[in-house]
Amino acid sequence: MQMKITYFKIRKAVAIIFAIAIAVCCAHHSSFQSVAATAMKNTAVQNTVQMPQVYPCGFPVGIYMETEGVMVVTTAQIPTNMETLSSPCEGSLQQGDYITSINGNPVNSKEELVSSVEACAGQPLTLHIVREQESLDISVLPIQDTSGTYRLGVWVKDDVQGIGTLTYISEDGHFGALGHPINDSDTGKRVSVRKGGLYESQIQMIIRGKNGTPGSFCGIICYDTSTFLGNIYENTSCGIYGNVSALMKEKLVRSALMQTAHKEEVVCGKAFLRCAVNGEPQDYEVEIIKTQPGSTGGFQICVTDKLLLEKTGGIIQGMSGSPLIQNGKMIGAVTHVFVNDPTKGYAIYAEDMLNH
């Protein structure tokens, strides 16, 4: 059984940032050898529904998302003037909860949470939380710390940011990226997004992957209205989605539309991975070694391009969302890397990304 681990690096108000972590799989070479032979049996194309054309991208973007409410990381004990430790939220709040309002007032940032708690005047607060898609109201009594300030005793987050790869843009200006969800690094749960944006980014350094240690992009995100590329409105199991900006639409003038493929059209053999290792998107040769058109499990690839292997060691963090092309069609995007062999990994079908 293969173990998949998806994680996301959190940074707060910084310009230099590591890439969004591509999902990591643990596997042995032998498992790939055993499945490659059976993968040669290709399924006949039966789907007659016309797939749309898109602009395949393959360049890095800065990703910034604000959470829906503030997300609970953990509860904590508070030192008081009574020379004791107290944790008002222990047993009431759980890791991964989202606090969306206090006493009916919306909470969308850490600052709003702190302000509401400090103004409680020692009275109980009603916290409206979302836990695993269930809405709950809980009552909590803040306590005063040694400085006399009222506290809840909870660590929270209200944003995430990183670098990932833009997969495609549709003719009507919608985009898809990453091919997998952004999960919180502490809770392991999918981040609930209130709003977010794509921004221009520049890759400054590449850390090569090696057996047992995935590599990574390290770059700069330019947070400015002049570098804004689009709005993020969804964080799903198939990636992040949104609308591109006027600036991004101008860049599409230099691009060409490409047909997308049905799952059944993806076959074992030669394909290309598009990513911007040297500044501009380029196509690098890969081998599709297993297809699973009848499932949501995606397909498996192996990097064979000598230049890409020399530069990155294979699939690295930040390549999540790199489009895959076969027979002139976009067939999917890279999503996972095998930690024991970074030349191999998983991909999501384009059809699944488009039908999310």
Where on the chain are the PLM-derived regions?
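PDZ/PDZ-like groove recognition
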Residues: 62-94
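Interdomain regulatory linker/hinge segments that flank or connect interaction modules
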Residues: 4-56, 236-284
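PDZ domains, with a preference for the canonical peptide-binding region formed by the helix
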Residues: 101-134, 341-343, 347-354
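Conserved PDZ fold ligand-binding element
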Residues: 88-110, 324-327, 331-332, 336
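Serine endopeptidase catalytic core focused on the charge-relay Asp
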Residues: 143-313, 317, 326-327, 335, ...
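PDZ-domain C-terminal substructure recognizer with occasional recognition of PDZ-binding tails
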Residues: 40, 44-51, 61, 94, ...
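Short, flexible surface segments
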Residues: 68, 95-96, 267, 320, ...
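Intrinsically disordered, low-complexity linker/loop segments enriched in Gly/Pro
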Residues: 83-87, 105-114, 122, 133-137, ...
